[in-house]
């Protein structure tokens, strides 16, 4: 009877804790969005995923009607953004914020080794701090890496449990449909499952796991093949510039703080000696010092978007994981998975750093440093909570300051005085600087003055297609060199076809949209845009900061 009462009480406590974690996560999503969700906009890559989702909504076939150097899992996921009863750009940023917080919770689940319903108070606060670190100064926009990390974290958690292993491998396989750089995730998942499987069944389990992980990719290929897009899919994927992780390794070797890593190694070696003594307070002090080094590394550059802090974290957390495996005499698969995810995140053309999982790296290091250690104070639980709250407070202060002063390709919050609702209702309450506002106002005026059923805005401005409900006649919404890959000829063929059909407006930037908010009006260069201009024979005119090529309805060439 006593055992039954205790079980009922424990289940009730777990439900309360689980509800507390959910409530805390929702509050954190709301807080992050309130701080950063409506600040800044730049008409380059912000909205690029939404533009591809918009194409799918209008019946276009990926890799056939539009170009993508990666599978289009992210545009499919973010069809959700269009279904929410909110202005599109607000919905997009809210979904992204929720994804980032959910990823932090899942990585916390993996690293702590217990479900959120069984977390102690200080662990929940630490996970909240890790979420802010991982979000750092990254723009709150739909992006492949954010979707991929969420699926990878979900998969790693689910493969820990026999009942959800299949679902876990489906999630890990789906990450490859989002971005092929997550190829290592299913292999790590297989290693996790194989490690807990009896030797006699290991081969069969491995093959079965790989087959489940292959299901999302196989379905993707089957569907696009049914529409005749397989040859172009292969061309676009293989034509993309490969990434081997060299950037991260180079950054760790050239910008990694060797002195900091050396300090970590010395402290860890000293910790081995200190722990050999019974009830040694030195172990607590050394662990506190190591924790300060790890957290200090994360905050040293104020969570800025660009910086070497994430590379340094990857380096020292890798050292901590190796030390922990040596101490425990067993392979730390969750630790390897998180460090490996940091490497996969760094496989990027434009953002080759592990910062989007930096908070998970910090949490991993802290949990492993304190693993098995009992603090020699009576109210140790209270001390742990107070320390965690202090770290969260410091992290939140740095986060808020950075998000208001170092806004992605825009100006500080005090200078964001232009409400983008003037451009389109789907911008909601987002604000930008007056120069970007004037740039977008001129663009909208040009579109109004020269009506056409097909409008292209080159080489940037991807968000404007779904926001202004425009049909882009070219197969790529953002003419960035790495997105183009080997599809130069295909884009020019589409431009020639557009010219023959007529009824189009193509606006060419005479200023680079990426630098408008920072230095005012500047000439930009885009070689492919110049080539497109050369094959269009519509009427050329100057319209605000754009060169317009216009072929009115009924004026086919």
Where are these regions (language model features)?
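Transmembrane-helix motifs of polytopic, lipid-linked glycan transferases
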Residues: 94-117
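Membrane-interface alpha helices of multi-pass inner-membrane proteins
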Residues: 153-156, 165-192, 215, 337-348
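Multi-pass, polyprenyl lipid-linked donor-dependent membrane glycosyltransferases
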Residues: 95-99, 122, 134-154, 178, ...
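Membrane-interface transmembrane helices that cradle and orient dolichyl/undecaprenyl
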Residues: 152-167, 273-276, 320-331
